[in-house]
Each structure stands twice: as C-alpha cells, then as structure tokens.
Amino acid sequence: MASNNDSIKKTLGVVIGLSLVCSIIVSTAAVGLRDKQKANAVLDKQSKIVEVAGIEANGKKVPELYAEYIEPRLVDFATGEFVEEAADGSKAANYDQRKAAKDNATSIKLTAEQDKAKIIRRANTGIVYLVKNGDDVSKVIIPVHGNGLWSMMYAFVAVETDGNTVSGITYYEQGETPGLGGEVENPSWRAQWVGKKLFDENHKPAIKVVKGGAPAGSEHGVDGLSGATLTGNGVQGTFDFWLGDMGFGPFLAKVRDGGLN
C-alpha cells in the first residue's frame, strides 16, 4: 500500500511540475508575443505616416525615415496651441490619444450636437505630426477618426503649410464592408483628396463627400462611395468634427496664420 501511495505521489509531482513548466513557457511566450505585436503596431503606424507624408524611402527603413523627417507634437484642443506634455504627463513620443479619450480626467464627453463623428469622447490633448526637412516644416499630418457603418475608421490627413490644402490621406484602420465602405483604402479614391481645400473662404469646414460624384473641378468635393452611403456619411461626419472648433480647427487656423514658423 505504501508503495502505491509513493507511486501516486510521484506521478502527481511529475504532473504538477510539468504543468508549472508549461504555464511558465506559455506565459513567457505570451509576453513576448504581446511585445512583438506592440512593436509591429508602432511600425505599421509609422509606415502609414511616412506614406501619407510622401517621403521617398531611398533605401532607408521606416523607423529611420520616421526619425529623420517626422516630429510628433502635442496640441491643446481648446486653444490650438502646442503643449509640451499632456494632462497625464505624457510627452508626444509616447502619448496615446485613444487611451486619453477613455479617461474622464483627460477627456470630455461630447454632446449629441457636438459629436458629428460619433466618437462619444474626445481627448483634451491631440497629437499631430510635423513633416520636416531640417528645420523647415513642409506639411502637417492630423489624425482623424469617426464611426462608419460597422466600425470606427481611423485616418491620417496630410495638410500643406497653408493649413488648408490636402496633400494626402490614408485610412489605416477600419472594418467596413470590403468592396463597398472598405474602398476608403482604395488608392484611386484617396487620390481624389489631393489638392482639395478643407475650408471655404470664411474658414469654415467645407469638405463634402458627394453621393453620385463630386462636380468636376470642385475645390471641396470628393466622390461618395458607391453602395456605401452610410460609410460616406461617416467620412463626412469625421471631417465635419475634426475640422471644427472641437477638433483641429483652432490648430489649423494657427497653421494658416504662420503658426508653424
């Protein structure tokens, strides 16, 4: 009987030992995978910023191009002024605007009238990306997001130093219907935005997503997305909000007045 008990104890010990070893291996692998996923997310974001900035690779890798030409800066949405750190103490290099928007202490809840993009909350501090060549700023990139039919759609918009002319746009995260709303990522549709004016002569948001197609030569209009009216409405709401007083409107006004110099 004692021999049987010893055998059972040894078996249990082996099982428990193996379980502990396996759990340690799995935990270590999970941590490593999570770190790799974060690194890949950062690289993908930098890649989209470099792309919309129109920077040529010339054999260089994305992190090198980003470090050389892109300068992230924080902006106080209330004033449109640059700030050195966000309310939570973050600097531009490590600021997470999405995370800040979820925290009551670092964001505001939007009213139904204000919330044209259907984002519910907006961080108090935003981030922009200056495209630089030495000390000279050639463009500014603003991140925008708004709700489509099925998903929150995130984009980067490159704007010339007049604070008004679009030089590029890229949607880098969205879950709209492939072939319909998902066409926000189509290069042909994105190409329409180049040269469009964000504001009218009175400095009011003027971008229009036109169902059926924008008139030829329109300064402010881009074609709607065929079969994806609600996604198009989401794009419209996104620009109505982020170009307005609650978004980057005050900041772009300062850019227009030479605030980047």
UniProtKB/Swiss-Prot annotation:
GO CC annotations on file: plasma membrane
What membrane topology is annotated for this entry?
Single-pass membrane protein
GO molecular function terms noted in the UniProt entry: FMN binding; oxidoreductase activity, acting on NAD(P)H, quinone or similar compound as acceptor
Does the record bear Transport in its keywords?
yes
Offer one example of a GO biological process linked to this entry.
Answer: sodium ion transport
Q: Could you tell me the EC number(s) of this protein?
A: 7.2.1.1
Task: Name what cofactor the protein needs.
Answer: FMN
Q: Where in the cell is it found?
A: Cell inner membrane
Q: Does the keyword Cell division apply?
A: no
Mark the transmembrane ranges: 12-32
Q: Name one Pfam family in it.
A: FMN_bind
Q: Which residues carry this modification: FMN phosphoryl threonine?
A: 229
- Protein family per UniProt: Belongs to the NqrC family.
Spell out the subunit comment: Composed of six subunits; NqrA, NqrB, NqrC, NqrD, NqrE and NqrF.
HAMAP family from the UniProt entry: NqrC (MF_00427)
Q: What does this protein do?
A: NQR complex catalyzes the reduction of ubiquinone-1 to ubiquinol by two successive reactions, coupled with the transport of Na(+) ions from the cytoplasm to the periplasm. NqrA to NqrE are probably involved in the second step, the conversion of ubisemiquinone to ubiquinol.
Query: Know the name of this protein?
Result: Na(+)-translocating NADH-quinone reductase subunit C
- Recorded source organism is Vibrio parahaemolyticus serotype O3:K6 (strain RIMD 2210633)
